[in-house]
Amino acid sequence: RNSVFYKEIIEKQQLAPSASAYNYSSEIAGQFSMSVRANANTSLNDIYDAIMQSLANFEANGVSDNDLKRIKAGQETAFYNSVSTNLSKARQLGFYNEYAGDPGFVTTDIANILSVTKEDVMHVYNKYIKDQHAVILSVVPQSQPELILDDSEEAFIKVEQVVRGKEKEFDMKYGQENKPFVKTETKYDRSEPALGELPLLTIPQVWTNSLSNGTKLYGIENSELPLVQFYLRIDGGQLLDPSDKKGTASLVANLMDEGTKSKTPAELEEAIDLLGSSISISAGLESISISGNSLAKNLDATLDLVNEILTEPRWDEKAFEIAKTRRLASIQQVKGNPQSLAFNALNKRLYGDSHPSATPLGGTADSVESITMTDLKNYFNANISPQVAHFH
């Protein structure tokens, strides 16, 4: 919410439910990508103009000390998460050995990340992003070519004709005649190692407790990394939605993440980011859950924010409208996803049309359109309670 994309494209112009930017670095060159999923019937010319305005805003305002602090905090947490399993440790050590010539470069890498300055950020922007060549891809419904960005060239895409029953005629050997498999040459020994002794499985000890308000606690301690992960489950979820307003629990979860009485959505996000923490709230069929990740030194401050979210919801009207728009866009997207369509159809056959489990998670377009802020408050007051909460 503090990014130039969110402020300009989503909050100010309200052209899209989501926007993101991502950098992918390779050995010789990198790729900086900006992606926006527009609202229905939105011209991609407007999206392009909004992206350019976002970049202009970034160039004019630069990077603040607070921005750099919260991004570094998040990078530090992400770095520790990237070596939190045996597999990820092996992968990272191998990566550093291959590209830096030293598996111990892991300590230098995190030091380099934490030493980045505001000047470094703007230098990279001016050198690699500003006024650079770019490939711009427009993807629109086939029936709405007028939404494509001006001066675009149509890319030829072969559309596969799906014929029911044709798969029975498919020959797995087609095209493989007289093409022996040739292994790629390598200097590494990839032969299967001899089978060693089976490792002993050490089951971590789970401790349990409970709070005076009735919340049950479960935990496992691991001191290898300075990280804490937590999960709070509140029983209920979509099963407790009014029958004609399915999707209420989902929107409640969305709004719980949109500020508190004393913090705007942007201020809450900044408070979380400055700790290098993450807090995610979601609704399922049978529960609403809050999951989080934090540096151990910032756990208490992170849990204070979770408590504030649970006890002092903001009920921001603007955030409510954005959440509804985003939910409706998501429901529309599902219509183009065969797997989701099949899953929803299966649930209707299994449970029957009137059963709560037959309704897609998050509701339908009609039910979401009918939900009001009062509905969210009523659900929250009736169902968010420590007596039905479990903390892991």
Predicted regions and their residues:
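Proteolytic maturation boundary segments
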Residues: 107-233, 377, 387
